[in-house]
Amino acid sequence: MSGTQSTITDRFPLKKPIRHGSILNRESPTDKKQKVERSSSHDFDPTDSSSKKTKSSSEESRSEIYGLVQRCVIIQKDDNGFGLTVSGDNPVFVQSVKEDGAAMRAGVQTGDRIIKVNGTLVTHSNHLEVVKLIRSGSYVALTVQGRPPGSPQIPLADSEVEPSVTGHMSPIMTSPHSPGAAGNMERITSPVLVGEENNVVHNQKVEILRKMLQKEQERLQLLQEDYNRTATQRLLKEIQEAKKHIPQLQEQLSKATGSAQDGAVIAPSRPLGDALTLSEAEADPGDGLCRTDWSSGDASRPSSDSADSPKSSLRERSYLEEAPERSEGVQDAEPQSLVGSPSTRGAPHIIGAEDDDFGTEHEQINGQCSCFQSIELLKSRPAHLAVFLHHVVSQFDPATLLCYLYSDLYKQTNSKETRRVFLEFHQFFLDRSAHLKVPVPEEISVDLEKRRPELIPEDLHRLYIQTMQERVHPEVQRHLEDFRQKRSMGLTLAESELTKLDAERDKDRGTLEKERACAEQIVTKIEEVLMTAQAVEEERSSTMQYVILMYMKYLGVKVKEPRNLEHKRGRIGFLPKIKQSMKKDREGEEKGKRRGFPSILGPPRRPSRHDNSAIGRAMEIQKSRHPKHLSTPSSVSPEPQDPAKLRQSGVANEGTDTGYLPASSMSSATSGTALSQEGGRENDTGTKQVGEASAPGDCLDSTPRVPTTVFDFPPPLLDQVQEEECEVERVAEHGTPKPFRKFDSIAFGESQSEDEQFENDLETDPPNWQQLVSREVLLGLKPSEIKRQEVINELFYTERAHVRTLKVLDQVFYQRVSREGILSPSELRKIFSNLEDILQLHVGLNEQMKAVRKRNETSVIDHIGEDLLIWFSGPGEEKLKHAAATFCSNQPFALEMIKSRQKKDSRFHTFVQDAESNPLCRRLQLKDIIPTQMQRLTKYPLLLDNIAKYTEWPPEREKVKKAADHCRQILNYVNQAVREAENKQRLEDYQRRLDTSNLKLSEYPNVDELRNLDLTKRKMIHEGPLVWKVNRDKSIDLYTLLLEDILVLLQKQDDRLVLRCHSKILASTADSKHTFSPVIKLSTVLVRQVATDNKALFVISMSDNGAQIYELVAQTVSEKTVWQDLICRMAASVKEQSTKPIPLPQPPPCEGDNDEEEPAKLKVEHHDLSVAGLQSPDRVLGLESPLISSKPQSHSLNTPGKSAAEHLFVTATQFAKEQHANGALKEGDGGYPVTIPGPHLPVSEERWALDALRNLGLLKQLLVQQLGLTEKSTQEDWQSFSRYGPASEEVQADSGIRDLENVKACHAREGQMSFKTGTGDIATCDSPRTSTESCAAQDSVILASQDSQASNVLVMDHMILTPEMPPAEPEGGLDESGEHFFDAREAHSDDNPSEGDGAVKKEEKDVNLRISGNCLILDGYDAVQESSTDEEVASSFPLQPVTGIPAVDSSHQQQHSPQNVHPEGPVSPFTPEFLVQRHWRAMEDTCFEIQSPSCTDSQSQILEYIHKIEADLEHLKKVEESYALLCQRLAGSALPDKLSDKS
């Protein structure tokens, strides 16, 4: 018997299953060798030596009586097959012959012994092998031995009986006691004549059949009476079964009485001295089976009155059970194993099977194993049920059977799990799209259509389940009947194993574990059948596999979820995890009531009888023995154990359920499987011996497990979550997933394992808060407060679930991979980063939330704002922010490393798969668990916003909102860190793919710099595809990277990113190529919009190698806007960082304290100007001049210590720029707009030459009016003007400076235009604005930095007469009426409104201008020569001559030269040095022409100058148009026709 388990797998391929059948269905009582063993000591006299017979004598007597003949027949298979059935082993007999079938036509008779099949000797073969040979072709040649045609039928037992001990045939069979003898046993001490014995056996059969028919009729009558009183589906089903069975019994009885004249039965005798133990079906009150045991020492028989029970028919049939090999195996085992109460024993009735009805073949199977009679009996026998499942899955649609079993599973599920199991039941069997759809009654389907399944109450659950089970039961019974027929033909699986299990079950209650082990092997066969399903049936097969494994797990079978099912679950969204399906109740008493098979230390999956008193004693013993903490490892085993092999549940020894055992009792458990037989089962005492090996229902492997109490998780994490009591599955040995195995419950323990703590958070949805509080409390709360409490509960619950997820990541992945050394420490750090810190933070946060919950005993939390602020602001915010940023920013690297290592390292790949299959992971992969930290951070602000939404008390609401804002700050910080990390990772990838092999020194001078380009040293701001439009016919697809200081233009080729220089032929120089760099430095970049394409932009690079214009086209307008904005901002940032302060001379101490602030202020102002000088429209127009925003504006004109000249020039410069801007905004109507990117509003380009002409016209009109004054009024005007000398000086300065700046601007423009048209020397690619803006910036800085000692300053209009330097008129602002502004109100009105306004009013009222000759005549001054000499002008002029502004202060010329300000860079026609020289000469030529106000030819001279200015401005306009045309040519676009014609 010990070798039975080890040979199961070897014997699975149907090698030698044994034929079993009921005697009731046989024609003669000569089937199988167990006839010898059927008679117990009640039938034999052990001292009778005459009972021994030899095989030869038996054959001789048989031949003499019957005269057997041997013949050969050839059978041709027809539409109904061969028309015969065979049975028996060694040899095989013809069981039945179908009337008018192929076998009957060939001459085969019932009872013929098959000698050969197609010439192959089969006398020592079993019936399965014979069936295979017969089915090998459409013809079969049989050599049979039997009675001659026309002679009486031969009992099968004659030629089949074979002693089990000696191996010889014995023709004598003992005569069993008659059923009516009531215990008086008749001993057979001598051989009985064959004819007489045959008659005795036949009479017994007839009597038994009559009695069975009578009992069945009585039972049918009782059932009908019960059904009339209470009509139930179950009673109706039993009535139908009884009505079906009665005709079968009547037919058998009629055949038996009609064949009384047939031959006799030879009863074999038993050798002396053999102790015979006959194991019949076991009377088990748990599963309803009636079995008997007889021993050779019994002196009497139990009465047959036990058949009067409601299951009498089953008992009658179980008495006739035959098992030839089982009895043989039992003899080799223990001869005494009595199981069951004597009251359950019945008298054995041995009868002959002389009828030839093959239609009742299933009764033979029932005679062998009554559990196949009904599904109710079968579902408690794991191995038998597994064989039946294999048959149904292979031959039929198993939906109805699985529906029946899952309904039964629902009934056995505890109340906590019923709703979930019903939802699964609905998804599998009732739903429209269910893969195992079964017919649903109309009333149920209508109800399911009306409401959602999760909203159906539990009472309806039970009703639906019961209705569906009754609905599918008839179909299940039909499958069972077909199975019995197939089994009779030997076409079912594991026949010999089931036979041995039945034999061992009678003598050893521990065989239930062997049944489970056998069922486990059969389940693998079922999985193989399901694996072969078509691809379209894959999901259906997975669902069937899930249901089967669920039910087998419920029966205690060790099931292992296959890898393919785990993978399929990802595609089958509805498929739930098996691990949760059977949460058993922990109370032993409740389990005893529900199942009748209580387990003290485990779930009720090991059926056995129970003793309530023993359960109570066990409870007391367990409570007294249970340790508070885990026992030490030293008490378990002296050998060290691999931590990876330890179960997380604690103790595990071949499925041992003693999760917590005293240390002193563990030594006996180390023997593994070498335990006593009694230790492997549950005794009637109800207690398990400490150290015994329980049923291997938990263990998936056959190797013994060394028990241990070492727990894998560190002590700080052992008691995190202990509010609820629940079960989880063990983490498998070596990380192997065991999805279907759960931890055995620890019914009386005070502490929980870490896995049980994890189970607390396995629910995806938080529990309803309203279920946690009393109804009285709920009635006293407002609806808003109830919702607030629910959100708070969700916050607490999800935090606990997140802690559990982090623990899974730590324990299932990090700790294990660290222990097993799969990854190096550096790789561990890259993947798991600072997981310990994150876990510690959230564990602490979870503990604080628990404290808040405990503080509010009613579960209604009043104030939480202060707690939230503590958690998410201050130190808590900083810790969480930085820790989360470190962890989350590492995600891209971690996921990339996991992906790459799984491809390269098979060991790591296997580990990850095993760990991900762990039920604790809830079907999440490692790459899904790592991002949960980021997901948690996004949930905080949402939850806090909802709490604030439902909070009515304003102070509390504000606190919660403030905490929510802090959570957003944390999230933003982490988001930024993640973006930067992702960008860094992408840059590293781009750097690896960067290809610089196409760079050639001949194409680009700085090729070495490009070859050494390192993208990883910079931060990436933006990336994306752009198209570079080189010209009209050529465009290049680019992948552009905007880094913090450069713009990189790459080309994608295969997997490479190519860095390449491109060139094009310029229109001006057709014989040469212009090379463009693929890397653009943002410090020299200007951005402009393309007028003809709203998806394109110009990027103008002012590099040392010349100006380069790139026309880049985005895919959409919005993308272009993003690119333009980001490039402008980054360019401004780079310029701001690279700008160095300009050294300015320190003012003398006498200038006052305010002067000390000037250099620093000007540095900052110049710094701001240089950052975005060409991108801010305000700066372009001069509105944001440093002088406007500087502190000197706040000083009045009469501030002590300040020279009047400094204020004059400050005022003049500001006024000139303001008027310039105003004029541009009011009068500008340029023909080609320019969009200036940046954060400010765009400004259109203006035609400055046109503006100058308009302003000149207005000036001409004004001067004509002023010169119209009579000669005689000149002296009076001078006298009147003398009272306003200081103010007049300012007015003069305003006018003069404006004129000079216009001269400077014109010079700059002319120089640039000249180059573009071929007249200049140095190339530039600036816009018309660029020179003006640059000069304005330099003028502002240098003007403000000058310091003058003079008090009287005369600034004169300077007209340049040379055509190379055309003069410019003042670009002062004009209002709509055409009046010219000469005041400087804006320079002082902001800070000194009183003084500024007063001075302005006086100036407007009293100032009169006079012009005489080449000079401006200032009214009110007595002597003209004070301002007309060269010496005075040179000594009093305080300005540094820069950028076109004439300066005559020779004493300061060297000290404040432009070289001191801008020492580096080449000298161009637009530099201060060049312009100063030319203006200085012009000053020398004109300063001596200043005459007194009395000159009479002044009018004609002014008109002459105006005429020259007009001519020069006309020329400037043409140059400007030519420049615009050239710019458009370079950009690949054409100007309108009118511009081309003008050029």
UniProtKB/Swiss-Prot annotation:
Keywords attached to this entry: Acetylation, Coiled coil, Cytoplasm, GTPase activation, Guanine-nucleotide releasing factor, Membrane, Phosphoprotein
Superkingdom as given in the UniProt entry: Eukaryota
Pfam family, any one: RhoGEF
SMART domains in the cross-refs: PDZ, PH, RhoGEF
Region feature (Disordered): 1-62, 281-355, 574-710, 1137-1158, 1386-1405, 1441-1468
Residue numbers of N-acetylserine PTMs: 2
Listed GO CC annotations: cytoplasm; membrane
Annotated ranges, domain PDZ: 72-151
Coiled-coil features, chain-numbered ranges: 194-262, 981-1004
Disulfide feature: none
Ranges of residues in domain PH: 1019-1132
Biased composition (Polar residues): 1450-1460
PTM annotation (Phosphoserine): residues: 41, 309, 341, 637, 1288, 1327, 1377, 1457, 1540
RGSL domain location: 367-558
Bias (Basic and acidic residues) ranges: 28-45, 313-329, 582-592
Predominant location category: cytoplasm
Biological process, per Gene Ontology: G protein-coupled receptor signaling pathway; regulation of blood pressure; Rho protein signal transduction
Domain DH: 787-977
Residue ranges with Low complexity bias: 293-312, 663-676
Gene Ontology molecular function: G protein-coupled receptor binding; GTPase activator activity; guanyl-nucleotide exchange factor activity
Annotated InterPro entries: ARHGEF12_PH, DBL_dom_sf, DH_dom, GDS_CDC24_CS, LARG_RGS, PDZ, PDZ_sf, PH-like_dom_sf
PROSITE patterns in the cross-refs: DH_1, DH_2, PDZ, PH_DOMAIN
Record PTM Phosphothreonine, positions in chain: 736
Function (record text): May play a role in the regulation of RhoA GTPase by guanine nucleotide-binding alpha-12 (GNA12) and alpha-13 (GNA13). Acts as guanine nucleotide exchange factor (GEF) for RhoA GTPase and may act as GTPase-activating protein (GAP) for GNA12 and GNA13.
Oligomer and partners: Interacts with GNA12 and GNA13, probably through the RGS-like domain, with RHOA, PLXNB1 and PLXNB2, and through its PDZ domain with IGF1R beta subunit. Interacts with GCSAM. Found in a complex with ARHGEF11 and ARHGEF12; binding to ARHGEF11 and ARHGEF12 enhances CDC42 GEF activity of PLEKHG4B, and PLEKHG4B, in turn, inhibits ARHGEF11- and ARHGEF12-mediated RHOA activation.
Name of protein: Rho guanine nucleotide exchange factor 12
Organism: Mus musculus (Mouse)
Phylogenetic placement of the source organism: Eukaryota, Metazoa, Chordata, Craniata, Vertebrata
Gene for this chain: Arhgef12
